[in-house]
Amino acid sequence: MNAALPAFIIVVSLAPSELAWAQNRGVYPLGMSAINSGITAEPGFTYSNLFLYYSRDESKGPEGEVLATGSNSVLMDMSSFVWVSGREILGARYSASATIPIANNSLASDAMGSISGGGGLADSYYQPVILGWRTERAGIRAIYGFLAPTGRFEAGADDNVGSGYWTHVLASGQTLYLTKDKRTAVSAFQMYEFHTTQEGTGVGPGQTISLDYSVMRMVPLSEDMSLQLGVVGYEQRQTTDKSGPGITEEQADARYAVNALGFAGNLGLPARGVGLGLKYYKEFSNRSTFEGYSLQISGSVAF
């Protein structure tokens, strides 16, 4: 079951003069919305818990060259609460959600050793408007959300958990069933992030566009149990330059790019309203950011 809950990742924040290879990414946790992206749940409440682990051991330059090696890891546990209305707006089912993340991060390099780390409440994410349409062979969702800087952030600190800025989001998810029995599905999820200026630094991190996608095949295991298996991937691109005090022309021009492919499985028990999921992604050909892998484990229950 797809709880349709984009939430947000903590941002490792260092001044450019402190560590040139610690480029930021967007704040969306890539890959989490790859499966059943256009599907809206049945009316009622859903609780979802998502555990994400991102591990990166190389920093890539603007041409994809390795600038440094070390470790950048992010652990997140996100509790999401979704309400789906039984009423429709513009022919679409209306829903809303809130996501509260707890996070832990660390950054180290082979040359400099431990650089930063922090843990605690991260930035929370709210989606006051989710509209979902569906036909016999497709589903689509349109979303407005915003990221509130509730995580700890102080300019120059080495234990930040939050980003230090607000983010507004426009997103959409689509799922297309390729077969009449709906056992083969292609899904895509797009998100555009509008970032404000970072508190205490005056830095504008640049805007970001992200894409998650999947091709999944459902295998019935019993009358009340099914398994989805397939291929997943994600992409992310910085669309505008970073700007602000201390940002050089070279740093402003170095827009990050992220690519990943992997595999996933979802176990569904629809009569009980329970879903379990596992995704693994391996990144490749990244530019101006870290490169590594991601493991994501999810569970949800509908009431």
What are these regions (language model features)?
Residues I143, R152-E154, D158-I247:
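Detector for outer-membrane/organellar transmembrane beta-barrel domains
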Residues N24-R25, Y53-M76, D110-G120:
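Surface-exposed strand-loop-strand hairpins of Gram-negative outer-membrane beta-barrel proteins
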Residues P43, S71-S79, I115-Y125, G162-H168, ...:
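Residues that define the transmembrane beta-barrel architecture of outer-membrane proteins
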Residues W21-N24, N36-G44, S85-S95, W133-I140, ...:
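Short loop/turn motifs that connect adjacent beta-strands in outer-membrane beta-barrel proteins
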Residues S37, N49, M78-W83, Y126-G132, ...:
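Residues on the lipid-exposed face of transmembrane beta-strands in outer-membrane beta-barrel proteins
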Residues V27, T201-F303:
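Outer membrane beta-barrel transmembrane domains
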Residues F45-S55, A96-N104, A142-A148, A188-F194, ...:
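Transmembrane beta-barrel strands of outer-membrane/channel proteins
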Residues A34, E63-T69, D110-S116, E154-N160, ...:
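Extracellular loop and loop/strand-boundary signature of outer-membrane beta-barrel proteins
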